[in-house]
Curated annotation (Swiss-Prot):
Rho GTPase-activating protein involved in the signal transduction pathway. Residues 472-520 have a biased composition (Polar residues). The lineage of its organism: Eukaryota, Amoebozoa, Evosea, Eumycetozoa, Dictyostelia. This is Rho GTPase-activating protein gacI. The record marks 263 as: Arginine finger. The gene is gacI. It holds the Pfam family RhoGAP. It comes from Dictyostelium discoideum (Social amoeba). Residues 226-451 form the Rho-GAP domain. It is found in: Cytoplasm. GO terms for molecular function: GTPase activator activity. CDD domains: BAR, RhoGAP. SMART domains: RhoGAP. It comes from the Eukaryota. SUPFAM superfamilies: BAR/IMD domain-like, GTPase activation domain, GAP.
Length: 799
């Protein structure tokens, strides 16, 4: 071998070594990437497994939570979350499989194949080089040519392998990012499906917590300066909050023996100490701890003044000031007849001569009842107790030195909102407050007649915000006149009136009721009274209809069971002997103008306020289940499967969607998709089903919005029908999906045994034979279907 050949050989060897070394470097980097990706891939598989474990834990929790007595839909939420977690598991598992198929395995195989080829080429070249060096001179030329040819081939092999490794590296990296892109797209798709459910669950929990916060009993952080409804709501199982009940029991005993109650102020330190005790929620124990009775009356006045709104607003009582003014004019001429008139009061339109001085009492009572009926229930309850205490103090005014005039000055402004926009000169005039004070005096005088004489043992409704507001009914008098008890002169008598204790010999009151009804509070007709009709009286029969009564015969009042307290013929005398007034049964006369109907509102219960939460649960379930049915549309492969889902939508539409549409008189806004006869039948079925899903959700959303805009306090027939329709639709969808899942399991088993596959509804088993026959049979009934079905079936007429 000459020098030139050896030099050329060395150069080629150097090129081969350089390429070989580069290949080894490429392989090292690629191997590192491949190993790291394999670890990441295993992590994704592990995350998929962990997600499945989380889903199983949630499912177990949801099954156990079904036995919990919770208003929060924890069972349904956990069940749905388990499904979401399984979806996430599938997404991670899918990513791991993509990385395995597109990245780690191809890269690993490329490294193995190319590295093996390079090593084989190098080994072959090395063996040939050794044989050439040992060959004889006769074969040297031939061996040299063979070696050079192999050397070129090996170099070309190295170059090809290097290029293959580089291409594989780039393609693998790009494929990995395509896998990530697919992963994130699937994640976004899954999250978009559950995002609305998540928002709805948040809304339900928020609404539930709001209701729970208003309904539950809790230790208040503040009592003074907040709404009276909130104070009553804290102890909804009691007629009065505990601190108010203790205060009134104490005042009942002490006010009749204490001079200047409500007028004399208490010391600042003792007043603040009692206020702080009330704020803390601790028992007051007034009889044992209070030395100064004026401290108790002062803290009651402080509580009343600190209310955001007075018990009676000016715009409420201002229209009744004329009643007080007219009463003052009548009293000037009828002072000597007050005792007789109070004994002969016939509430709301009595028989007798209404033009006389005593006859005006019926009108006064009616107007005062109407005034009280405009107040919220808790305002009525508190006002009654205050007026009873004032009435007691007035009865014992010789000791208390507090007659009605004094009481109207010191306590009236704490109950009735002061007259607004008074000028300085008006305040100095006594006549400015004459009607104001007279109205307060009338309320105290007639406290036992303007308030019902049944117990108020439960203030459940007071805890319900907004609805306790104006509990009214349209009536003037009760179905039978109750005896009027004398004013209580002892705690026992007052207690008997408040609790309805029939054991008291001086009272004839109904037994205590177990729950709060509208009859426990003042219920007055807002219509006008005909004071000139002297021959009729309005009474309420058992069926709730006020009929025109014939003039009652003269009655003789029975002797009172207990003697009334001593009275003097003054305008402040409110003592009333117990009498029994016998009123004959009224005759029915529907054409008389005095005929009135009572439209009593049924009491709202806690469940009435939780109805919107139940509706939100129904709405979430319906939306979710319809979405699951929609997901089956993607898997339709045959016309029969599509017709199976169409029949399912048809059943839902006929039985549930069409009634809702008729209830709302709703017209769909979503336009029908254009259809072409040239399109594939399965594709047309899918498009039709997607459109059906969209208009179904459109109607459901509109119905839900309509329900949310309705009033809880006054539920309409529309809202009741929507609630019932949603409940039934939720049940039928759950049952249908359960049937579909069972059929899927059966079909999967048949597939494993060599049978068919596919997705259909529970009606799909009855669909067989020629597709056109199915289409014809469906089209033949199009004209009799609801608009929702017609939109589906009409577009399949060419199948």
């Amino acid at each position: 071998m000459n020098i030139k050949s050896l030099r050329k050989k060395n150069i080629q060897n150097m090129d081969q070594e350089e390429v070989y070394n580069r290949i080894k470097e490429n392989v090292a980097h690629m191997d590192e990437i491949q190993r790291t990706m394999e670890k990441q891939q295993q992590t994704f598989f592990q995350m998929s497994l962990q997600s499945k474990q989380i889903a199983e834990s949630m499912k177990k929790y949801s099954m156990d939570a079904a036995y919990f007595n919770s208003r929060i839909p924890i069972t349904d939420c956990l069940s749905r979350a388990s499904e979401w977690q399984n979806s996430i598991s599938e997404v991670f598992n899918h990513l791991g499989n993509l990385l395995y198929d597109r990245t780690t395995q191809p890269l690993k195989q490329t490294i193995s194949i190319q590295l093996e080829m390079v090593k084989e080429g190098k080994k072959k070249l090395k063996n040939l080089s050794t044989d050439t060096s040992k060959s004889s001179s006769a074969n040297l030329k031939k061996d040299t040519e063979a070696f050079e040819r192999t050397q070129k081939e090996t170099l070309q092999l190295y170059n090809d392998s290097e290029l293959a490794l580089e291409n594989s590296t780039v393609q693998t990296i790009l494929s990995s990012f395509e896998s990530y892109n697919d992963f994130f797209q699937r994640g976004v798709f899954q999250m978009s499906k559950i995002k609305s459910d998540i928002d709805n669950y948040k809304k339900i929990i928020l609404e539930t917590n709001k209701v729970a916060a208003k309904l539950r009993n809790y230790v208040p952080k503040k009592t003074f300066g907040i709404k009276l409804e909130e104070v009553f709501a804290r102890e909804s199982n009691k007629p009065l909050p505990s601190f108010l009940d203790e205060i009134f029991r104490y005042l009942e005993k002490e006010s009749i023996n204490t001079e200047g109650m409500f007028r004399v102020s208490a010391g600042k330190s003792s007043l603040e100490a009692l206020q702080q005790k009330i704020e803390s929620g601790a028992p007051l124990e007034l009889s044992a701890s209070i030395i100064d009775p004026h401290c108790v009356s002062s803290v009651l006045k402080l509580f009343l003044r600190s209310l955001p709104e007075p018990l009676v607003l000016y715009n409420v009582y201002s229209k009744y000031l004329t009643v007080a003014k007219n009463n003052n004019n009548n009293n000037n001429n009828n002072n000597n007849n007050i005792s007789n008139s109070s004994s002969n009061l016939n509430i709301v339109g009595s028989s007798g001569n209404n033009n006389s001085g005593g006859g005006s009492g019926g009108t006064i009572i009616t107007e005062l009842r109407r005034l009280i009926s405009t107040l919220p229930v808790c305002n009525q309850a508190l006002l009654k107790q205050i007026l009873l205490i004032c009435s007691l103090m007035n009865q014992h005014r010789d000791v208390t030195k507090m007659d009605l005039t004094n009481l109207s000055v010191v306590i009236g402004p704490s109950i009735l909102e002061p007259i607004p926009n008074l000028k300085a000169e008006d305040i100095q005039r006594p006549e400015t407050f004459a009607d104001f004070n007279s109205l307060f005096c009338l309320l105290v005088e007639h406290v036992l007649t303007i308030f019902p004489q049944v117990s108020q043992t439960s203030m459940d409704m007071a805890s319900l915000p907004t609805t306790i507001g104006k509990l009214r009914s349209q009536s003037d008098i009760s179905s039978q006149t109750k005896p009027l008890p004398s004013l209580p002169t002892s705690p026992q008598n007052r207690s008997a009136i408040i609790t309805g204790d029939s054991s008291s010999p001086s009272l004839n009151t109904p037994p205590v009721k177990s729950s709060l009804n509208s009859s426990d509070f003042v219920i007055v007709d807002n219509g006008s009274n005909n004071n000139n009709n002297n021959n009729t009286t309005n009474t309420i029969t058992n069926n709730g209809i006020a009929d025109t009564a014939t003039p009652p015969p003269p009655t003789t009042p029975t002797a009172p069971t207990t003697p009334p307290p001593p009275t003097t013929p003054t305008s402040n005398n409110i003592a009333t002997p117990i009498i029994n007034i016998n009123i004959p049964n009224s005759s029915n006369n529907n054409n008389n103008n005095n005929t009135k109907r009572i439209n009593n509102k049924s009491n709202l219960k806690v469940d009435d306020y939780l109805t919107p939460i139940d509706m939100q649960i129904y709405y979430i379930n319906i939306s979710s289940n319809l979405g699951r049915i929609k997901s089956y549309v993607d898997d339709i492969e045959t016309v029969n499967q599509g017709i199976g889902l169409i029949k399912l939508f048809k059943k839902i539409s006929d039985d549930h969607m069409a009634p809702i549409k008729n209830i709302l008189n709703y017209k769909f806004k979503t336009e029908k998709p254009p259809m072409s006869n040239d399109e594939d039948k399965v594709l047309r079925i899918k498009r039709t089903l997607f459109y059906t899903y969209e208009i179904t959700m459109e109607l459901i959303s509109h119905a839900n919005n309509t329900f949310e805009s309705s009033s809880i306090e006054e539920p309409t027939e529309l809202s009741k029908k929507l609630e019932e329709s949603f409940k039934q639709l939720d049940t039928i969808l759950t049952d249908e999906l359960s049937n579909i899942e069972k059929q899927q399991q059966q079909q999967q088993q048949q597939t494993n045994d060599g049978g068919g596959s596919g997705i259909s509804s529970n009606t799909n088993t009855s669909i067989s034979g020629d597709n056109s026959e199915n289409g014809d049979s469906l089209n033949s009934s199009t004209s009799n279907q609801s608009p929702l079905n017609s939109s589906i079936l009409t577009q399949l007429s060419n199948q």
